[in-house]
């Protein structure tokens, strides 16, 4: 697996990425390359890099799934009596998004996938005939559908790989192989569930188009994701940041230091976001107007958007804040972690510490000793409430 140990050349400095000029156009020194190699060696034991044979297995499995989709769409087209000329070129395609599409998935990670179909294929077709087709495949295990979810999904294990499949029906007669989902015009005449399903691919692809050096971005993101997980701040549900938010912060760092490599970018990440003046938003590009009347993040128009504490705005239309769950307390925790990360990477760059120090897991009970007792109190109080509920219910039954 190739890793970036040097800049891509002076041409990178000719283009401005993001909404501001770069902070620095400095190119890597020998020490930066050495530190980047040490970073790679430090990351390896944590399983953040997949072996080549595992990667090829994923590619092969996705290819099989893609062929199944094409075959299924042809069958649906025949059942709906489309002309033979259309059936022969009807297409259909599986796109990936999330960590796999970004190129930062870890060993054994699942794959987020999107099934894109032409206009005559309904979502109900996916959850009926395609679901039945999947059932018949010997590679498919643990098949289940969640049709009524906020974003409807089919979950399965395909040849040992866990895959989540979303669905989007485009207003096109056929789906070409070279379809670019970043094209905003594809959103016209789509229902909201299709737009939500498309959003993951559109955001992921846009991020990759907005960084100056994809290899440096990927290695930096692997390091930051591992650091966030080790420090227990990788969770959108708990009010911290999820995968796409971390990716956008790393992408913004890459835009500000377009010629830097991973060892420098990890340090600059902590430098930038330990000093960021929240709630100023993090933007990878200026929001675009598409006149499709979809709700977008805009504090000038939407009063509720003004109360977001740590806005990180997705770069694809319709732009959304990916961190709406962040609270005052979780933001304070993250900012403190950024400051500690900066202090450690300062030491690493001065050759006074090793990369392993950055990924040392903090002692939870030393750091949050009072939270433990509060949780015990909450559990105890919950038991009292549950017992009282049962008692009240029993009394009501007796009275009857």
Swiss-Prot record:
Q: Which residues bind Mg(2+) 2?
A: 110, 112, 164
What enzyme class is recorded for this protein?
A: transferase
GO cellular-component term (any): nucleus
| GO MF terms, alphabetically ordered | ATP binding; metal ion binding; poly(A) RNA polymerase activity; RNA binding
The catalysed reaction is: RNA(n) + ATP = RNA(n)-3'-adenine ribonucleotide + diphosphate
- State the name under which the record lists this protein: Poly(A) polymerase type 3
- UniProt key word Nucleotidyltransferase: no
CDD domains membership: NT_PAP_TUTase
One Pfam match = PAP_central
Where would you find this protein in the cell? Nucleus
* A GO BP entry: mRNA processing
Q: How does it assemble?
A: Monomer.
- Record's function text: Polymerase that creates the 3'-poly(A) tail of mRNA's. May acquire specificity through interaction with a cleavage and polyadenylation factor (CPSF).
Q: How is the cofactor bound?
A: Binds 2 magnesium ions. Also active with manganese.
Similarity remark? Belongs to the poly(A) polymerase family.
Q: Does the keyword Amino-acid biosynthesis apply?
A: no
Its lineage reads: Eukaryota, Metazoa, Chordata, Craniata, Vertebrata
Q: Which SUPFAM superfamilies match?
A: Nucleotidyltransferase, PAP/OAS1 substrate-binding domain
| The entry's keywords | ATP-binding, Magnesium, Manganese, Metal-binding, mRNA processing, Nucleotide-binding, Nucleus, RNA-binding, Transferase
